[in-house]
Structures are given as structure tokens and as C-alpha cells.
Regions:
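ATP-binding/phosphotransfer module of carbohydrate and carboxylate kinases, centering on a glycine-rich
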Residues: 1-16, 50-54, 116-167
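Glycine-rich nucleotide phosphate-binding loop and flanking beta-alpha elements
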Residues: 26, 88, 158
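Glycine-rich phosphate-binding loop and adjoining helix at the ATP-binding site
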Residues: 1-78, 162-167
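Short secondary-structure boundary segments
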Residues: 22, 83-86, 154-155
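Glycine/GP-enriched mid-protein hinge/lid loop-to-helix segment characteristic of carbohydrate kinases
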Residues: 47, 51-143
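Flexible, active-site-adjacent loop/turn segments at secondary-structure boundaries
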Residues: 29, 34-37, 109-114, 154
Length: 167
């Protein structure tokens, strides 16, 4: 990865900022709970700073997407974006009062850690009944965050019909 990045930077010397969007908890360059095992429990920011002079931003992938969602729908100052991939775990980015919310240790939005199901049950539900999993996660967001809008990006549900009569 570093070799490829250096090659790109050598070709285009106008690049001033590098932004890495990673599937995992990213806290000031330290990566935790990452889908990329080579990055897990490593301070990627410190590793890159030793080799690269450009400014480096490292953020969770769904948080980056939620910033884009907010810019598209900026009239919603309090929003959330849920990403439901076909594999692994669901994530969520949250915008509160127009700003990305990471939580104390950048763990906010890790819906895969909600106590409804263990990881094996979540994997099974993602394959067999992704609608149920998504509805529980949406209900949780509504009860805790109460966003004005929730964007949903799902790789497994083509026709999303959310039914939450209790909210």
C-alpha cells in the first residue's frame, strides 16, 4: 500500500492531502475493529507520517459517506447514514448539528456491536432476513439519536420497505 501511495505522489506532486477512508474504528490514526486485518491495531497515521509529507486524514468509511449525505441533504442538521454491506457488518455515520459525531473514542456508529445479536447471528440475518436487522438498527438510532433523516445504503435489500409502527 505504501509503495503504491508513494508512486502516486511522485507522479502528481500537486497532491496536498491524503484521505484514507477505512472500514473500522479510526481514532487519531489508530485503527481498531478494522475489516482489513493488516491495519488492525496499528497507528496508520504514524506509519504514513514517517514516509509522507502531505497532510493525512484517516476516517471511518461510513463516516465519510455520511458527510457526503449531509452535504447532499444539508437542510437536515441531524442525520444518520446506515450502510448495510453484503458481507461483514453494518456501520452508521451520524451528523449532529451539522457536524460529524464520532463519540468519545470514535466508536459511535458501530451498529455491529449492538446487543441484539452476536456476530454469527448478525451474519445469518444479513443473509436470511436483512430487513429485520436493518429495522432494529433504525429503531435504535431513532430512540437514541432521533435524527431528522436516515439515509440507507444496502447491498442486500433492493426494495427497502421499513415498517416501524411503534415509532
Amino acid at each position: 500500500f505504501l509503495k503504491m501511495l508513494k508512486k502516486v505522489l511522485k507522479k502528481d506532486q500537486e497532491i496536498a492531502v491524503i484521505c484514507l477512508s477505512l472500514p473500522g474504528v479510526c481514532d487519531q490514526g489508530m485503527i481498531d475493529l478494522c475489516d482489513f486485518e493488516d491495519f488492525q491495531n496499528k497507528n496508520i497515521l504514524e506509519i504514513l507520517k514517517k514516509e509522507i509529507k502531505q497532510k493525512i486524514i484517516i476516517e471511518n468509511d461510513v463516516n465519510c459517506a455520511s458527510i457526503g449525505f449531509y452535504h447532499q441533504y444539508s437542510h437536515y442538521q441531524n442525520s444518520a447514514l446506515i450502510y448495510q454491506p453484503a458481507v461483514d457488518y453494518v456501520g452508521c455515520g451520524m451528523i449532529i448539528q451539522g457536524k460529524l459525531y464520532n463519540g468519545f473514542s470514535h466508536f459511535a456508529g458501530e451498529l455491529r456491536c449492538l446487543p441484539f445479536y452476536n456476530h454469527l447471528q448478525q451474519e445469518r440475518l444479513l443473509k436470511d432476513d436483512p430487513q429485520e436487522l436493518l429495522e432494529k438498527q433504525i429503531a435504535t438510532l431513532c430512540c437514541v439519536l432521533n435524527p431528522e433523516a436516515i439515509g440507507i445504503c444496502s447491498d442486500v435489500l433492493k426494495d427497502i420497505q421499513i415498517s416501524l409502527p411503534f415509532l
